[in-house]
Amino acid sequence: MMRMCWLVRQDNQHQRIKLPHLEAVMVGRGPETKIIDKKCSRQQVQLKAECNKGYVKVKQVGVNPTSIDSVIIGKDQEAKLQPGQVLHMVNELYPYIVEFEEEAESPGLETHRKRKRSGNSDSIERDAAQEAESSTGLEPGSDSSQCSVPLNKGKDAPTKKESLGHWSQGLKISMQDPKMQVYKDEQVVVIKDKYPKARYHWLVLPWASVSSLKAVTGEHLELLKHMHTVGEKMIADFAGSSKLRFRLGYHAIPSMSHVHLHVISQDFDSPCLKNKKHWNSFNTEYFLESQAVIEMVQHAGRVSVRDGMPELLKLPLRCHECQQLLPSIPQLKEHLRRHWPK
């Protein structure tokens, strides 16, 4: 019985790639992956399968960002890719998963294969999409316990217009969809986060094309102020009667290409809050306060993000109210109940 590992493109654009045990395999732009995007290096990642341990070591070799579950690995840095996680080759594009199989040869019989997956294919795509932060049709204040997402499969799956991105395209479409809009004016639109990490979780997006915080200049100062004002309006209009505390801010390294302001209640009462990366993205310096961003642009004309931000996502789980350390997400969630308003 021999264990094998395969790299599988989720949109089935090419045949799966074999990753031999402990053998370094370079993957990137080229005929094998059918990736022609020049932002993807020919040697974008180095993959080394640990077949006995059930994961793949991923080293980002290319300049542009490679991510696992929307967390950027970083140039010359390594991360583990496990079954159920999604590797985006570059710039949140070209999604891959890994599959482990046990192969046994029997005389006169075809090779018998058992595929090891973390859940079914639907759950894999659903978890991958969670980091995309696109919108949902839920009404403000409605039950956030439903974290399902309709899936595009087969010929209906988006394979063209790759410049928009596999997941970011969904966000831009949601901005334009009246059913998804909670509020809009001439400058911004507000949509409900598709995978809310708390009872209330909105995204405020400008109509103007601003790719990320790195693209923000002094010319965007009034827009940032307006986005903040609209975020406060959402709290007043839809959560004013609650005693919940809110924060407004941006992820230092967002998973989406279109800049967006998070407006999120501090209860973190949501089944979509599933792992340490989710928690730390909102409860460490990875989450940049909206007012702090405004002040940076006001004084320096740009937003500065310090090095080492991805490492913050790996920090131990710590309660944001009392600073107590918790060993797991379920225990953290149980602990948070004591801090909810009575």
From Swiss-Prot:
Keyword Translocase: no
Active site positions: H260 (tele-amp-histidine intermediate)
PTM-bearing positions, type Phosphoserine: S118, S123
Keyword Transmembrane helix: no
Subcellular compartments: Nucleus, Nucleoplasm; Nucleus, Nucleolus
One Gene Ontology cellular component: nucleolus
Coiled-coil parts of chain: none
Residue ranges of every copy of the FHA-like domain listed in the record: 24-73
Keywords: DNA damage, DNA repair, DNA-binding, Hydrolase, Metal-binding, Nucleus, Phosphoprotein, Zinc, Zinc-finger
Enzyme type, top EC level: hydrolase
Biased composition (Polar residues): 132-149
Site feature Interaction with DNA substrate, where: S174, H251, H262, K277
EC nos: 3.6.1.71, 3.6.1.72
Motif (Histidine triad motif): 258-262
Entry text on domains: The histidine triad, also called HIT motif, forms part of the binding loop for the alpha-phosphate of purine mononucleotide.
Stated name of the protein: Aprataxin
Source organism: Canis lupus familiaris
Gene: APTX
